[in-house]
Amino acid sequence: MGSGYQLLQLPRERFRKTSFLVWVIILFQRAISMPLGIVTNSTLKATEIDQLVCRDKLSSTSQLKSVGLNLEGNGIATDVPSATKRWGFRSGVPPKVVSYEAGEWAENCYNLEIKKSDGSECLPLPPDGVRGFPRCRYVHKVQGTGPCPGDLAFHKNGAFFLYDRLASTVIYRGTTFAEGVIAFLILSEPKKHFWKATPAHEPVNTTDDSTSYYMTLTLSYEMSNFGGEESNTLFKVDNHTYVQLDRPHTPQFLVQLNETLRRNNRLSNSTGRLTWTVDPKIEPDVGEWAFWETKKTFPNNFMEKTCISKFYQPTPTTPQIRARRELSKEKLATTHPPTTPSWFQRIPLQWFQCSLQDGQRKCRPKV
């Protein structure tokens, strides 16, 4: 009997280690990491946000900061033919609009003006107070026609169209937007003793130097059968010169293409439409899919290095399109423009550690 009891009894040292491990598990369950709450079309009500994020986690809703996060950070294709396939028309679904407080710089934004075959508009005008997304590196301005089988254009993946501090579930006519979602950052309240010392006010030199701003470059397109399975996209160089876009490409590729056509006098010199097709051997992913360039450095990035040296035209299909011709066969080496680092290129996502103190749950950023 005694020996049996000895088998069930843990040695003193092992008992200490086991009880310590149990306490660690209990405390770990009490103080868990809390992720960001991502809000999509189906969770727009404040009460739902309170139940999901705020209950027993925050002392006040002032600790919630709504932030617009761009989808392009997830690595989605941003060229116009690929992006437009993510949008579709639906009827009978009321649009929803939600405000957000802060956002990111967008590498790619879009601006659509689409008409039906009878000349009527496919997209509604923006409501009062809805302005275009204010921070875009490239604005892809698309004009064209399509069947538009529905009242409003929605995002097929349930994402938002981000405008200036307003996010909507629908696309508005002629209003620049970025694709994204709304996230809620949970900020810990500062302790009172943080502010006991008198703050030191240092002089700040404000400047209106426009060379320090980011430049927005608008790229124009014409599209037919918008929203259909077989849509056709043309990059517009000028009113009479276009380039057929058959493959995914970077905005930097289109900038180089535009510069090459102009430098080599390949623009249309008549009233007829001249349509170029890019040689299939040319890689359309010059540069990077998402990077920043300042206005100060931008003009020199593509002027001296040209990696696109040959284009050819398709066989004429209408009398207005001029005869097929080919450029020289040589191909220069592809040179990638350098990436300009920026500390505010992305808003960091932060996790928060919560624990019970004096009967209240306190949250602080997790280090």
Curated annotation (Swiss-Prot):
* Any GO MF annotation of the entry: channel activity
Record-level GO cellular component terms? extracellular region; host cell membrane
The signal sequence is 1-33
The disulfide bridges present are 109-136, 122-148
Database matches in InterPro entries: GPC_FiloV, GPC_filovir-type_extra_dom
Keywords assigned: Cleavage on pair of basic residues, Disulfide bond, Glycoprotein, Ion channel, Ion transport, Secreted, Signal, Transport, Viral ion channel
Q: Which GO terms describe its biological process?
A: monoatomic ion transmembrane transport
Q: Has keyword Membrane?
A: no
**Name the record gives this protein:** Pre-small/secreted glycoprotein
Source organism of the structure: Reston ebolavirus (strain Philippines-96)
Q: Which gene encodes it?
A: GP
